UniProtKB/Swiss-Prot annotation:
<dbReference type="GO" id="GO:0006543">
    <property type="term" value="P:glutamine catabolic process"/>
</dbReference>
<feature type="active site" description="Nucleophile">
    <location>
        <position position="79"/>
    </location>
</feature>
<feature type="active site" description="Charge relay system">
    <location>
        <position position="172"/>
    </location>
</feature>
<feature type="binding site">
    <location>
        <position position="106"/>
    </location>
    <ligand>
        <name>L-glutamine</name>
    </ligand>
</feature>
<dbReference type="GO" id="GO:0036381">
    <property type="term" value="F:pyridoxal 5'-phosphate synthase (glutamine hydrolysing) activity"/>
</dbReference>
<keyword id="KW-0378">Hydrolase</keyword>
<dbReference type="GO" id="GO:0042823">
    <property type="term" value="P:pyridoxal phosphate biosynthetic process"/>
</dbReference>
<keyword id="KW-0315">Glutamine amidotransferase</keyword>
<dbReference type="GO" id="GO:0008614">
    <property type="term" value="P:pyridoxine metabolic process"/>
</dbReference>
<feature type="active site" description="Charge relay system">
    <location>
        <position position="170"/>
    </location>
</feature>
<feature type="binding site">
    <location>
        <begin position="134"/>
        <end position="135"/>
    </location>
    <ligand>
        <name>L-glutamine</name>
    </ligand>
</feature>
<protein>
    <recommendedName>
        <fullName>Pyridoxal 5'-phosphate synthase subunit PdxT</fullName>
        <ecNumber>4.3.3.6</ecNumber>
        <ecNumber>3.5.1.2</ecNumber>
    </recommendedName>
</protein>
<dbReference type="GO" id="GO:0004359">
    <property type="term" value="F:glutaminase activity"/>
</dbReference>
<feature type="binding site">
    <location>
        <begin position="47"/>
        <end position="49"/>
    </location>
    <ligand>
        <name>L-glutamine</name>
    </ligand>
</feature>
<comment type="function">
    <text>Catalyzes the hydrolysis of glutamine to glutamate and ammonia as part of the biosynthesis of pyridoxal 5'-phosphate. The resulting ammonia molecule is channeled to the active site of PdxS.</text>
</comment>
<dbReference type="Pfam" id="PF01174">
    <property type="entry name" value="SNO"/>
</dbReference>
<dbReference type="InterPro" id="IPR021196">
    <property type="entry name" value="PdxT/SNO_CS"/>
</dbReference>
């Protein structure tokens, strides 16, 4: 059985566990570096990206996560997790993990639209996926190897680059598991 980790330092962890299990895989809440060795793919959940970064630094996760990526293992960042994956963040000099060739802007839908739902068409996933956006970032630019999977009002809200998948919204907060299943298929392909 595939083992999918959810970085369990902060954020929407249990909801991801539920969606992984609903797709028939085993979920592992990753709180220690050595747990990275036992999983086939990793979800970086939503939460607060600066808090998550502080905790990643405190527990020494940055380098091991880069090594996990270098080993070819898939990673899926949702909301704050997308910010962690990005090579460039608007208004910041340094990225967090800097793995995915995208530029993201934090809280980019404005305070008035702090949270909202929108129907999205996501390439390879669904034409009618309800995206739950909470203080969401969006992808401002993508590198040439990056495939744009979804846009909302002209803004990129989901993308994939090889083993990396990222989205602005929270797929784990609905009972629609198709985005999680798409990631599990990526993990299956990477293992094959």
């Amino acid at each position: 059985m595939m083992k999918i980790g959810v970085l369990g330092l902060q954020g929407a962890v249990q909801e991801h566990v539920r969606s992984i299990e609903a797709c028939g895989a085993e979920a592992v809440v990753v709180k220690k570096i050595e747990q990275l060795e036992e999983i086939d793919g990793l979800i970086l959940p939503g939460g607060e990206s600066t808090t998550m970064r502080r905790l990643m630094d405190k527990y020494g996760f940055i380098e091991p996560l880069k090594q996990f990526a270098a080993a070819g293992k898939p990673m899926f960042g949702t909301c704050a997790g997308l910010i962690l994956l990005a090579k460039r963040i608007v208004g910041y000099d340094e990225p967090h993990l800097g793995l995915m060739d995208i530029t993201v802007e934090r809280n980019s839908f404005g305070r008035q639209r702090e949270s909202f739902e929108a129907e999205l068409s996501i390439a390879g996933v669904a034409d009618d996926f309800i995206g739950v956006f909470i203080r969401a970032p969006h992808i401002v630019e993508v590198g040439e190897d990056v495939e744009v999977l979804a846009k909302y009002e002209g803004r990129i809200v989901a993308a994939r680059q090889g083993q990396f998948l990222g989205c602005s919204f929270h797929p784990e907060l609905t009972d629609d598991y198709r985005m999680t299943q798409y990631f599990l298929n990526m993990v299956k392909e990477a293992k094959a």
